[in-house]
């Protein structure tokens, strides 16, 4: 699949990640609800948002941490982040597998919409475990291969254990960044192997549908989403699963 650590996919002028999120208010708010649900009542010394692009999720973290850092490999996304985030949030260029922090020095790590670029996330999960404080938390979002619609499609065949490339055949080139969905059991085993254990999970973007977004008021979608996230987590229903991880078993 080529060099999956490259940042040039998001450095290219044709890739407008900020623009990508226009019209995706439901998806953003669903992820905001998940972050708030997992972190409400907690306060941290230093939060790091890994692979956070222009800072969409990073911007949610100052109310939970004294110091917030966006660690992003793309120089272009960091330039956009400087305008989007403004002052008060540190921005550094770093790969998820090579974070410039001392072992055990970070008490909150978030990594959202990064796993779908990582066919094998072992190195990145191990790096999160390395920098995470022994009593800290990590929030990792997983693109869920076993979501309800896919389980119906694969009825009788089961869900593959390994990652599945969701790119169209014409876009499957070695010079393109991977886009994969993961088997959640495999990911939780990979996390456990590096010392990260699941404390809680949420099913996110459960109502992601162009039709629903057109006909159902936004506030109603969010009300249902808020109630559905914990309720549907056991079913692994949604296309996105948020995991709250800790180094304590």
Region locations from a protein language model:
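A short glycine-rich, Lys/Arg-flanked "PGG" loop and its adjoining helix->strand segment in the class I
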Residues: 122-137
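Acceptor-substrate binding/catalytic loop of class I
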Residues: 170-186
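A C-terminal cap/extension of S-adenosyl-L-methionine-dependent methyltransferases
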Residues: 153-160, 184-189, 200-249
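Class I SAM-dependent methyltransferase SAM/SAH-binding core
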Residues: 52-98
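Conserved class I S-adenosyl-L-methionine
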Residues: 1-53, 56-60, 77-80, 84, 138-165, ...
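A conserved beta-strand element that flanks and buttresses the S-adenosyl-L-methionine
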Residues: 110
């Amino acid at each position: 699949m080529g060099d999956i650590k490259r940042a040039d996919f998001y450095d290219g002028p044709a890739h407008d990640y900020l623009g990508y999120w226009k019209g995706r208010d439901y998806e953003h708010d669903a992820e905001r609800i998940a972050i708030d649900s997992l972190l409400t009542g907690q306060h941290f010394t230093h939060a790091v948002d890994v692979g956070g692009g222009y800072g969409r999720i990073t911007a949610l973290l100052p109310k939970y941490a004294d110091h917030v850092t966006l660690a992003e490999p793309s120089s272009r996304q960091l330039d956009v982040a400087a305008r989007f985030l403004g002052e008060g949030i540190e921005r550094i260029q770093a790969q998820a597998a090579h974070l410039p922090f001392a072992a055990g020095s970070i008490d909150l790590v978030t990594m959202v919409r990064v796993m779908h670029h990582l066919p094998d996330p072992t190195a990145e999960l191990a790096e999160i475990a390395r920098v995470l404080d022994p009593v800290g938390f990590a929030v990792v979002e997983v693109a869920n291969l076993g979501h309800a619609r896919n389980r119906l499609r694969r009825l009788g065949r089961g869900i593959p254990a390994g990652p599945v490339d969701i790119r169209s055949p014409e876009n499957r080139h070695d010079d393109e960044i991977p886009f994969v969905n993961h088997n959640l059991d495999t990911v939780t085993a990979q996390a456990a192997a590096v010392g990260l254990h699941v404390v809680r999970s949420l099913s996110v973007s459960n109502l992601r549908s162009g039709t629903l977004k057109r006909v159902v008021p936004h506030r109603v979608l969010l009300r249902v989403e808020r109630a559905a996230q914990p309720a549907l987590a056991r079913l692994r229903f949604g296309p996105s699963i948020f995991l709250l991880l800790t180094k304590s078993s």
